[in-house]
């Protein structure tokens, strides 16, 4: 359960940072 959420967060966070900072 937890590892799946952790992987999801690890996958989503970089895209959020990319969208906010425009650094991709």
Swiss-Prot record:
Protein species of origin: Pelophylax ridibundus
Annotated disulfide bonds: 18-24
Similarity comment: family membership: Belongs to the frog skin active peptide (FSAP) family. Brevinin subfamily.
Protein function: Antimicrobial peptide.
Cellular component terms (Gene Ontology): extracellular region
Tissue expression: Expressed by the skin glands.
Chief location bin: secreted
Keyword Secreted: yes
Pfam families registered for this protein in UniProt: Antimicrobial_1 (PF08018)
Listed GO biological process terms: defense response to bacterium
Key words of the record: Amphibian defense peptide, Antibiotic, Antimicrobial, Disulfide bond, Secreted
Name under which the protein is recorded: Brevinin-1R
Record's keyword annotation contains Oxidoreductase: no
Localization (cell): Secreted
């Amino acid at each position: 359960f937890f590892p799946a959420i952790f992987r999801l967060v690890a996958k989503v966070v970089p895209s959020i940072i990319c969208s906010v900072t425009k650094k991709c």
